[in-house]
Regions:
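AlphaC helix of the protein kinase catalytic domain
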Residues: 81-90
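Conserved short alpha-helix within the protein kinase catalytic core
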Residues: 91, 95-102
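Short, glycine/acidic-enriched loop or turn micro-motifs at the edges of active sites
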Residues: 77, 120, 137-139
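Conserved catalytic-loop position in the HRD/HxD motif
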Residues: 112, 117, 122, 134
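Activation-loop N-terminal segment of eukaryotic-like protein kinases
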Residues: 125-128
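C-lobe/activation-segment region of protein kinase-like
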Residues: 131-158
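Conserved ATP-binding subdomain of kinase catalytic cores across diverse folds
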Residues: 1-82, 100-111, 115
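Short glycine/proline- and charge-enriched loop/turn segments
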Residues: 19-23, 88, 134, 152-155
Length: 158
């Protein structure tokens, strides 16, 4: 990951590597993690889940095959990871995180989504909000049973 600024705004660039020739072949028939993260951030924003604001995704190609990719999103500002909270943390921050998590899980269930890697490091806490990050594992499920199993795994992982 890298941080940069442009025209007074701060951005984060997350790189996804292509690890092998087989990985390149798989990417020929599927979306890259950067593209998927961009899609997930847009979907979550649309349904009211607070996440990083997506700016762009970039895909490198060579000989017609996809390689590395980058996901660019707005920097969240001064934030701490949820796993940095402790018993001495501000109770308002803890309440904010828990309230946001419940709201997000309800929204995800109603719209058929699961996160795929829901855990404390994937929430950033700012002075005004809790922000869900690391969206490359997000899935939208067509069947209620699959969605319920995936959401149960998300909750258990926490």
């Amino acid at each position: 990951m890298a941080e940069t600024s442009f025209d007074g705004a701060r951005y984060v660039i997350k790189r996804y590597n292509c690890t092998s020739p087989l990985h390149r072949l798989r990417l020929a028939v599927s979306t890259s993690r950067a593209e998927h993260s961009f899609w997930a951030a847009r979907q979550f924003t649309r349904i009211g889940i607070v996440t990083t604001l997506p700016v762009a995704w970039v895909q490198e190609t060579s000989w017609g095959l996809r390689g590395r990719s980058w996901f660019v999103y707005e920097h969240t500002g001064d934030a701490i990871r949820a796993d940095d909270l402790s018993d001495e943390s501000d109770p308002k921050q803890i309440d904010q995180l828990l309230g946001t998590m419940v709201k997000n899980l309800v929204q995800m269930r109603e719209h058929g989504f699961s996160h795929g890697d829901l855990k404390p490091p994937n929430y950033l806490i700012t002075s005004s909000r809790a922000v869900m990050i690391d969206l490359d594992g997000v899935r939208q499920h067509k069947h209620a049973r699959a969605r319920q199993r995936a959401l149960a795994r998300d909750v258990a992982r926490w």
